């Protein structure tokens, strides 16, 4: 297994950020990648002594042990729990990332975010001499079930979709308030039927079957799998719906503070959005005039809180609050409240001494608008570090690249042009030239006769022209048939090019489409261990991972 560095595949604002273009970097309080900036942030976090380190550490240590039990790892050492315990130390720091709770861990990039988080935490701990804990924030409060409900696998020469169903009575429920689907066993059997047989499969099969009943919902199913996969490397998983979390000192007052500062938050976001627009990019987040930055849990459903005159109302429900009523609820019952895409990172950084946040390209574009949002809450946005970006190139695909003198850079734009070149090189008949010459000769032979007939009789001249068109059409029909037979003879080449595209760029970057487990079952834990060796210095690039 080996890495090769190539140009970043991030585009738009995120692409400009990883390439350190000054006009985009200026939107962020810290430059990337700048170890001195990370060290400065670490010193600032250490000087801030109001984080609920001890209480949060206790909650997270207990949660890592629960995840170990769910995954069948009870009795073994639990490095994630050990790391959670280290968070209680007075000078501890955190590197944070997060993602939705995707089915069977979702797309590959979820794993790459977690791996980057572990790597960066290890690097910063070595530099600062302080405990630096890698934390993965599961987006259990998100209510977009469609986004997490399916994964894609490559089966032969086609992509298959594995889906879990939702319960009709759980519409708009947060993922963390949903129960496991009744037909999860059916989903698992479909998943298993498309996975390779290997020596690494049985332990995972046992885990997947065990998780049909233990977790409380899809969020814990996801968290338990991620814990088994990366807990041994110290990844600490945080669920914002964890019992007791919103009662922690900094968390309990957070929602009331958001309501009290909503005007400043809205103005800060507007400034950030306008800056992005002036640079020629499309903002990823904008808010309507009545929208706040919070949701409210009502009868299980996660509903947006909207301004309504001097008070508030819930979208999709006939429920209103006065300002004082909502502020009182936020103080007394913070569990009723949930952040949105703007305030989620603020809550995260109220709880954790975040030294850096590991972000995907979409998140980078979001954070570009948030600097003044943080300031509105008296906070500073952490350094934003791009996640590891990877394409896995298996041996048989690498051989095809070599055979046809293709590079990875050829693949995203499509290989049709290169395929035509290959087919043309195999065209010993010279089909194009042959039929162009034939058509030219037919026209040369016909046209003098057509012209003489037209001079003799216009009506017969029209008939002669139609006759020429029919002859040309027959020649072109013959050309199509000859080309079709040529393509049949070249089908192996077509299949090879199709295979390269399906494996490396199936209509989008591989990391955004496929799941980790087909690769993990083929290559075992060495796959993860090699990913954990990816150089942090390469985060501004794309990595080709040959295995």
Swiss-Prot record:
Recorded family membership: Belongs to the BshC family.
Top-level taxon of the source organism: Bacteria
Species of the source: Heliobacterium modesticaldum (strain ATCC 51547 / Ice1)
Keyword DNA damage: no
GO molecular function per UniProt: ligase activity
Family annotation (InterPro entries): Bacillithiol_biosynth_BshC, CC_BshC, Rossmann-like_BshC
Taxonomic path: Bacteria, Bacillati, Bacillota, Clostridia, Eubacteriales
EC number: 6.-.-.-
Keywords annotated in UniProt: Coiled coil, Ligase
Coiled-coil features, chain-numbered ranges: 462-484
Role according to the record: Involved in bacillithiol (BSH) biosynthesis. May catalyze the last step of the pathway, the addition of cysteine to glucosamine malate (GlcN-Mal) to generate BSH.
Pfam families, A to Z: CC_BshC (PF24850), Rossmann-like_BshC (PF10079)
Enzyme class: ligase
Name under which the protein is recorded: Putative cysteine ligase BshC
């Amino acid at each position: 297994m080996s890495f090769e560095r190539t140009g970043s595949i991030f585009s738009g604002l995120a692409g400009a950020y990883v390439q350190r273009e000054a006009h985009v970097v200026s939107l962020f309080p810290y430059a990337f990648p700048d170890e001195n900036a990370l060290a400065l942030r670490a010193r600032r976090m250490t000087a801030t002594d109001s984080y609920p380190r001890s209480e949060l550490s206790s909650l997270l240590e207990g949660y890592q042990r629960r995840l170990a039990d769910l995954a069948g790892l009870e009795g073994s050492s639990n490095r994630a729990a050990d790391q959670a315990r280290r968070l209680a130390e007075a000078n501890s720091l955190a590197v944070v990332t997060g993602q939705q709770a995707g089915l069977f861990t979702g797309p590959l990039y979820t794993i790459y975010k977690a791996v980057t988080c572990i790597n960066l935490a290890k690097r910063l701990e070595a530099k600062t001499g302080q405990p630096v804990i890698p934390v993965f924030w599961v987006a259990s409060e998100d209510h977009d079930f469609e986004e997490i409900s399916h994964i894609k696998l490559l089966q032969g020469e086609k992509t298959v979709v594995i889906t879990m169903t939702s319960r009709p009575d759980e519409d708009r429920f947060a993922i963390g308030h949903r129960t496991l689907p009744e037909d999860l066993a059916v989903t698992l059997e479909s998943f298993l039927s498309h996975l390779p047989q290997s020596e690494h499969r049985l332990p995972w099969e046992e885990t997947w079957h065990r998780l049909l009943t233990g977790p409380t919902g899809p969020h814990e199913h996801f968290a338990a799998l991620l814990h088994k996969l990366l807990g041994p490397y110290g990844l600490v998983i945080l669920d914002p719906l964890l019992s007791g979390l919103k009662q922690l000192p900094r968390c309990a007052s957070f929602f009331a503070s958001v309501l009290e500062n909503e005007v400043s938050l809205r103005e800060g976001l507007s400034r950030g959005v306008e800056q992005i627009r002036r640079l020629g990019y499309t903002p990823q987040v904008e808010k309507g005039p009545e929208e706040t930055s919070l949701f409210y849990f009502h009868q299980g459903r996660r509903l947006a809180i909207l301004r309504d005159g001097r008070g508030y109302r819930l979208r999709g429900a006939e429920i209103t609050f006065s300002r004082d009523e909502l502020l009182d609820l936020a103080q007394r019952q913070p569990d009723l409240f949930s952040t949105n895409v703007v305030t989620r990172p603020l809550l995260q950084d109220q709880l954790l001494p975040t030294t850096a946040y590991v972000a995907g390209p979409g998140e980078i574009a979001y954070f570009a608008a948030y600097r003044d949002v943080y300031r509105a809450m008296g906070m500073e946005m952490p350094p934003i570090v791009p996640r590891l970006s990877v394409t896995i190139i298996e041996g048989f695909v690498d051989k095809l690249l070599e055979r046809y003198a293709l590079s990875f850079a050829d693949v995203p734009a499509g290989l049709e042009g290169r395929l035509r070149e290959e087919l043309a090189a195999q065209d010993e008949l010279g089909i194009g030239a042959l039929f162009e010459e034939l058509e030219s000769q037919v026209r040369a032979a016909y046209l003098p006769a057509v012209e003489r007939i037209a001079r003799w009789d216009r009506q017969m001249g029209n008939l002669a022209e139609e006759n020429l068109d029919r002859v040309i059409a027959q020649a072109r029909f013959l050309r199509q048939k000859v080309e079709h037979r040529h393509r049949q003879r070249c089908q192996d080449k077509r299949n090879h090019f199709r295979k390269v595209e399906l494996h490396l760029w199936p209509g989008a970057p591989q990391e955004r489409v496929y799941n980790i487990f087909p690769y993990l079952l083929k290559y075992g834990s060495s796959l993860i261990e090699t990913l954990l060796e990816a150089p942090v210095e390469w985060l501004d690039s794309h990595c080709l991972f040959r295995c």
